[in-house]
């Protein structure tokens, strides 16, 4: 034990979230760690994690994301809207339905294209087998070797395919996949963010680590577990 290298925690590099209150509590997101994020549907998990990736790029880190819920173009638009900010977002209306939507201005889009180039990478979930755990892990490893990515996102655990034939196999598959992500984070000294939806909780207002759906190994293997909820005015 006495021969273990002495490391000053303050010297370890971390990627800040850009949320001062959160950064002051955890010191940022450190290499070789896995963070699990949970919360009710529509609570803002994907939005916040998209912002964390943008913040990482702003800190000269390269990032790689897997999204099992959004197509590539929808994921891109979501990230671009966040990165552009309100000054460079235009409100438009569909001439047939009247539905309003928001779009990044051409000026800002061109700037963001140049800013994100070779810094922000997205796994292609439309490719055959692109949502299997083997494909995700393989692409993540390639992103480290080829592009030097240091921050990763899996959004979300339920969208990955494990080849399970029953519930028991599915939960073991989830646990094994989380274990592979932990090993990947430690081996490559990167940080992995993982979105895991909570199980049904009969309207419970506050969610904790025990509310994460699937196997308990998901949170047991994580370095950080965060629960997001949308607060309403009382």
Could you say what each language-model-derived stretch is?
Residues 1-88:
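The Walker A/P-loop phosphate-binding site
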Residues 22, 154, 192:
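Catalytic phosphate/metal-binding cores of nucleic-acid and nucleotide-processing enzymes, i.e., regions
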Residues 24, 60-147:
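Cytosolic-facing regulatory segments adjacent to core modules
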Residues 25-28, 42, 78, 107, ...:
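Phosphate-binding/switch region of NTP-binding enzymes
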Residues 35-37, 64-66, 121-123, 193, ...:
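Hydrophobic/aromatic beta-strand patches that form the interior of the parallel beta-sheet core
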Residues 67, 153-154, 195, 221:
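Generic enzyme active-site microenvironment
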Residues 69-73, 126-130, 158-160, 197-202, ...:
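Conserved nucleotide-binding/hydrolysis micro-motifs of P-loop NTPases
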Residues 121-187:
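Phosphate-binding/switch loop-helix module in NTP-utilizing enzymes
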């Amino acid at each position: 034990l006495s021969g273990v290298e002495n490391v000053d925690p303050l010297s370890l590099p971390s990627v800040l979230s850009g949320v001062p209150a959160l950064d002051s509590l955890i010191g940022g997101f450190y290499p070789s760690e896995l963070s699990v994020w949970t919360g009710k549907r529509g609570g803002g998990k994907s939005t916040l994690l998209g912002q964390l990736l943008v913040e990482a790029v702003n800190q000269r880190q390269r990032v790689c994301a897997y999204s099992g819920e959004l197509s590539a173009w929808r994921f891109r638009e979501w990230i671009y809207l966040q990165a552009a900010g309100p000054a460079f977002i235009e409100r438009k209306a569909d001439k047939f339905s009247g539905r309003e939507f928001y779009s990044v201005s051409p000026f800002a889009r061109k700037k963001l294209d140049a800013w994100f180039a070779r810094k922000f990478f997205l796994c292609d979930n439309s490719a055959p087998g692109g949502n299997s755990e083997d494909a995700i892990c393989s692409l993540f490893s390639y992103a480290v070797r080829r592009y030097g990515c240091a921050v990763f996102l899996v959004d979300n655990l339920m969208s990955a395919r494990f080849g399970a034939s029953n519930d028991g196999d599915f939960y073991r598959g989830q646990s094994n996949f989380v274990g592979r992500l932990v090993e990947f984070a430690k081996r490559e000294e990167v940080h992995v963010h993982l979105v895991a939806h909570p199980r049904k909780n009969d309207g419970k207002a506050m969610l904790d680590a025990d509310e994460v759906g699937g196997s308990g190994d998901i949170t047991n293997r994580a370095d950080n577990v965060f629960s997001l909820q949308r607060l309403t005015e009382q």
